[in-house]
């Protein structure tokens, strides 16, 4: 396959009116990634392929989203909506460059897998001229039927045009196709619009190709591979299927999920073997968790790196730039953002650590805050190795605390603290014997006077 050139035409011009959204349909997300980007990733999984996007509303946004994951692509606007074959021909310029294979896919089918598309391309390599991707749903009602004779696909018949006998066929059209490049333009140009809607249907090329004596065949893929997204309910269903795939993949690779159905991953989440994830955990984009880590319940991770045997949560939040070394700990009700946490360092309770470096084996007490923002600019806090930050301390950045330094509880630290130093930044306590009794009597009298006046 590696020596066959390929053009993948991604049809992404649909209006998506049933989504009831200002956002183009193909930019809605499954697992944090736009639908169309899932499709492009699947295409790229078949080997080297140029991509031609057929776009409509939000064309530049769609193109930009795809180019973030795939690099430069060609985009062609479908100015009129005259059917699927018409949409493919919007990319006429790209097709005319000449390719061994053409893949025709839809930008709203995020669950298509690379191996399904690769199977279609392999059929082309074996001599087929046109390969249609089909599936067998539990009920074929409403789907176009794939009509086969003698091992060849001869036509696609829509439900409303099918005979009673044809309606019994369970093999249905998934819409996606692979086409030998040398025949592509001739077949597409032969599609007419002699139908009730006056549109050019891509499905017609099956009968056209068969009539020309070409080798036309179909392959079967799992039903979920060809699910199209038309509304928010179907978007949620696709999310569920994607998450279930990812959960199974991770568990089979050696990750323990205590309650799999409650853990949600992003398209690029990487979890190494021997990680344990408790219930109700959410992974945003760009998270890597190293072997042996423990993620407790109700934690939220995004843009974070978690080292070997680190421990997170429960109720912890790791934001972009959080980088935790091995055996470090971020405990309950802690937030870490754009900070490096050294080996064995502990941030156990009720803390905010932002724009900081925490040295190895340092201990950050409960209620510690790095005051990193003055309303205009961010500033950095640097804490050395084996430092102890007492509870309820405020570290006003920019500030540096040396190795083995000790910050007394309740301190507000505004100046650098040298290594091995003790810093106290709080008012001296005053204790006045008997004053509590006097205050109680005073306040009780005031309250009683207010009650009488009412």
Curated annotation (Swiss-Prot):
GO terms for cellular component: cytoplasm; membrane. Its main location: cytoplasm. The keyword Transcription regulation does not apply. GO terms for biological process: cell morphogenesis; cell wall organization; lipid A biosynthetic process; peptidoglycan biosynthetic process; regulation of cell shape; UDP-N-acetylglucosamine biosynthetic process. Residues 233-253 are annotated as: Linker. It catalyses: alpha-D-glucosamine 1-phosphate + acetyl-CoA = N-acetyl-alpha-D-glucosamine 1-phosphate + CoA + H(+); N-acetyl-alpha-D-glucosamine 1-phosphate + UTP + H(+) = UDP-N-acetyl-alpha-D-glucosamine + diphosphate. Transmembrane segments: none annotated. Its cofactor is Mg(2+). UDP-N-acetyl-alpha-D-glucosamine binds at residues 11-14, 25, 78, 83-84, 144, 158, 173, 230, 319, 337, 352, 363. Pathway: Nucleotide-sugar biosynthesis; UDP-N-acetyl-alpha-D-glucosamine biosynthesis; N-acetyl-alpha-D-glucosamine 1-phosphate from alpha-D-glucosamine 6-phosphate (route II): step 2/2; Nucleotide-sugar biosynthesis; UDP-N-acetyl-alpha-D-glucosamine biosynthesis; UDP-N-acetyl-alpha-D-glucosamine from N-acetyl-alpha-D-glucosamine 1-phosphate: step 1/1; Bacterial outer membrane biogenesis; LPS lipid A biosynthesis. Gene3D superfamilies: Hexapeptide repeat proteins (2.160.10.10), Spore Coat Polysaccharide Biosynthesis Protein SpsA, Chain A (3.90.550.10). Its EC number is 2.7.7.23, 2.3.1.157. GO terms for molecular function: glucosamine-1-phosphate N-acetyltransferase activity; magnesium ion binding; UDP-N-acetylglucosamine diphosphorylase activity. Binds 1 Mg(2+) ion per subunit. Mg(2+) binds at residues 108, 230. In the N-terminal section; belongs to the N-acetylglucosamine-1-phosphate uridyltransferase family. In the C-terminal section; belongs to the transferase hexapeptide repeat family. Homotrimer. This is Bifunctional protein GlmU. It comes from Brucella abortus (strain 2308). The lineage of its organism: Bacteria, Pseudomonadati, Pseudomonadota, Alphaproteobacteria, Hyphomicrobiales. The gene is glmU.
